[in-house]
Each structure stands twice: as structure tokens, then as C-alpha cells.
């Protein structure tokens, strides 16, 4: 048996649901999808869900992860084994841990390859900070996986599909974290997974102010702006959602233009599937040039304006 009898899917990020659903179609005969609202339920059915389970009734001061108890109960009630697919977001990984505990299931994070043999999943993912690929065969009846962005192509919606909708009512967990306040994050909506052209900046750009030069290039060629992990996590020059690398975005654009990025393996794992890589770096020995199809050795602050002017003609 090279598929599971059923798979359970949940995504806290709507843009990640299509790829998870495509993976679910390849890995199981029946697809169950947990959703948070009616609109997500309609989308899930159009993407291939046989059954939609709407999570309902959570108080405003509780977090989505507190649904883990009723989600696990629902999964157990409908089969003695199964596969759970979640995005490798922060919330996805936290929920995976909670579901793994409740289902007595093995949990594997950041999966990049999944196969099924004899009803058991074999998972490959990066280990040792991206220096190697680990392979794990999951022996527990249930398997809980968080999936790296770009592992599957996005499923295409089909409005003619039909499915059954159910409601899963909130049950307060015995122990939970209560949210006391919410602060909106200042962030521009972006879906880098779908971008054809990506301009990505590293610390070699020099300063937060110099990122405007990359933004002007993006505007000239219709690209999306991304960054390396140090730019987002260390310098705080850009938001977390835009950094490319092993623990976040895994992109497959037609063009990846790396500006001031050294090219460490942890970053390149997220960019190496690009059709064409163009690098700009003042260090001729930077590892990025080992991956690049084209490269310019020089100061990005001087090169970007000239490149923008040439491409804007």
C-alpha cells in the first residue's frame, strides 16, 4: 500500500493550503481538511477535500493551537492511523507538537520529500543546519509532518468538486496559554511562493536605507523582494515572512537575483531550485558564485542603480 487511507490537513496560512492539498492528493485516498471559517471550507473542497471540518467556538483570548485536543479526538474517531500535514510555520510546528503528543505519533518537521510504503511514511529533510539530508521512516500509526514551502506544487481549484462539511466544537484544554493582548504587525502582504522574479538582499546591501535600491529594481522588472535570514532575524531590516532559507521560504522562481548574499548552505537550500540565479557580491570568493548562473563582482550599492536604469528602458 503506497498511500494512507486518509490524510488530515490544516494550514494557518491560507496561501500554503493549495500545496498541502496537492500533497494530500498524492499521499492518501481520502482528504480531510480542518478550517477556521466557511470561506476556507469552500476553498478546501475546490482543492480536493472530501470532508471539511470547521473548527468553531474558540474564545478570542485563546490561540488556534488550543484546538489540538478536539482535532486529535476527531482524527482518532475516524481511523486508527493516518497522516497529518501542516505548514512549517511557527504555529504549524507548535500545533504539530501538540497533535503528536495527543496521537502518540512521530513528528517530523520541515519535510521536503515524502513517500509511503506499506502504510508508513518515509520523510526526508535537512539536518545539521542544511549540511546533510536526513531520512526517517515513521513507524507509529499516525504521522504528523510539517511541510517545507515549495515541496509540492499548488493544487488547482475546481469549482465543480463537492464534499461534506462538519463542525468541530471548541473544548477548552486542561492547560492553555491565554492571550492577553494582540499587536498588529506592520507587514505588506506578499506571496513569494508564487513570484516569477525575486530580488533578495543580504547584509552586503550595507544598511536598511539601501534596501530602497533593491525595491526600485523590483519595481522596474516586476519582481518581489526577499532577504536572507540575518537581514530579517538579526538586523530586523525586513519582516520574517520574507526571508529565504532552510527554516522558512523555499522558492522556485524563474529568476533569483541575490544582492549582497554570501551564499551559505542554509540560505541556498531555499533558493537553489530557482531556474536562474544571478549574484551581485563584492567578494569574488563568496560561496554564492558557486551556485550562480551569472554574477557580478562589485559593490551592490553602485551596481543596483545602473542595473535598474538599464532594465527600466
Curated annotation (Swiss-Prot):
Identify the metabolic or biological route this protein is part of: Amine and polyamine metabolism; carnitine metabolism
GO biological process, alphabetically ordered: carnitine metabolic process; fatty acid beta-oxidation using acyl-CoA dehydrogenase
Q: Which GO terms describe its molecular function?
A: electron transfer activity; flavin adenine dinucleotide binding
Against InterPro entries, the record matches this protein to:
DHS-like_NAD/FAD-binding_dom (IPR029035), ETF_a/b_N (IPR014730), ETF_a/FixB (IPR001308), ETF_asu_C (IPR014731), ETF_asu_C_CS (IPR018206), FixB (IPR023461), Rossmann-like_a/b/a_fold (IPR014729)
Which positions are annotated as binding FAD? 255-283
Q: Which domain of life is it from?
A: Bacteria
Q: Which SUPFAM superfamilies match?
A: Adenine nucleotide alpha hydrolases-like (SSF52402), DHS-like NAD/FAD-binding domain (SSF52467)
Q: Has keyword Protease?
A: no
Q: Which keywords accompany this UniProt record?
A: Electron transport, FAD, Flavoprotein, Transport
Matches recorded under Gene3D superfamilies: HUPs, TPP-binding domain
Q: Report the function annotation for this chain.
A: Required for anaerobic carnitine reduction. May bring reductant to CaiA.
- Summarize the subunit comment: Heterodimer of FixA and FixB.
**Entry similarity comment:** Belongs to the ETF alpha-subunit/FixB family.
Kindly provide the name given to this protein in its UniProt entry: Protein FixB
Taxonomic path: Bacteria, Pseudomonadati, Pseudomonadota, Gammaproteobacteria, Enterobacterales
Amino acid at each position: 500500500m503506497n498511500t494512507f487511507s486518509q490524510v488530515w490537513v490544516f494550514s494557518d496560512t491560507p496561501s500554503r493550503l493549495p500545496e498541502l492539498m496537492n500533497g494530500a492528493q498524492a499521499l492518501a485516498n481520502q482528504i480531510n481538511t480542518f478550517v477556521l471559517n466557511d470561506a476556507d471550507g469552500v476553498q478546501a473542497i475546490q482543492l480536493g477535500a472530501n470532508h471539511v471540518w470547521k473548527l468553531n467556538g474558540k474564545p478570542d483570548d485563546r490561540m488556534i493551537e488550543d484546538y489540538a485536543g478536539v482535532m486529535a479526538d476527531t482524527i482518532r474517531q475516524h481511523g486508527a492511523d493516518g497522516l497529518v500535514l501542516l505548514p512549517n510555520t511557527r504555529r504549524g510546528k507548535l500545533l504539530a507538537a501538540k497533535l503528536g503528543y495527543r496521537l502518540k505519533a512521530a513528528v517530523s518537521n520541515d519535510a521536503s520529500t515524502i513517500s509511503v510504503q506499506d502504510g508508513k511514511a518515509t520523510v526526508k529533510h535537512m539536518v545539521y543546519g542544511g549540511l546533510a539530508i536526513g531520512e526517517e521512516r515513521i513507524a507509529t500509526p499516525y504521522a504528523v509532518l510539517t511541510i517545507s514551502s515549495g515541496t509540492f506544487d499548488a493544487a488547482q481549484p475546481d469549482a465543480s468538486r463537492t464534499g461534506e462539511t462538519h463542525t468541530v466544537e471548541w473544548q477548552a484544554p486542561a492547560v492553555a496559554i491565554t492571550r492577553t493582548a494582540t499587536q498588529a504587525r506592520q507587514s505588506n502582504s506578499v506571496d513569494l511562493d508564487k513570484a516569477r522574479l525575486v530580488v533578495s538582499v543580504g547584509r552586503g546591501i550595507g544598511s536598511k536605507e539601501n534596501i530602497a535600491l533593491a525595491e526600485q529594481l523590483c519595481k522596474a522588472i516586476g519582481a518581489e523582494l526577499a532577504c536572507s535570514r540575518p537581514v530579517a532575524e538579526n538586523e530586523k531590516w525586513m519582516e520574517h515572512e520574507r526571508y529565504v532559507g532552510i527554516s522558512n521560504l523555499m522558492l522556485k522562481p524563474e529568476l533569483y537575483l541575490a544582492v549582497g548574499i554570501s551564499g551559505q548552505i542554509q540560505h541556498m537550500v531555499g533558493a537553489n531550485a530557482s531556474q536562474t540565479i544571478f549574484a551581485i557580491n563584492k567578494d569574488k570568493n563568496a560561496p554564492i558564485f558557486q551556485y550562480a548562473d551569472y554574477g557580478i563582482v562589485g559593490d551592490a550599492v553602485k551596481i543596483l542603480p545602473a542595473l535598474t536604469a538599464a532594465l527600466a528602458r
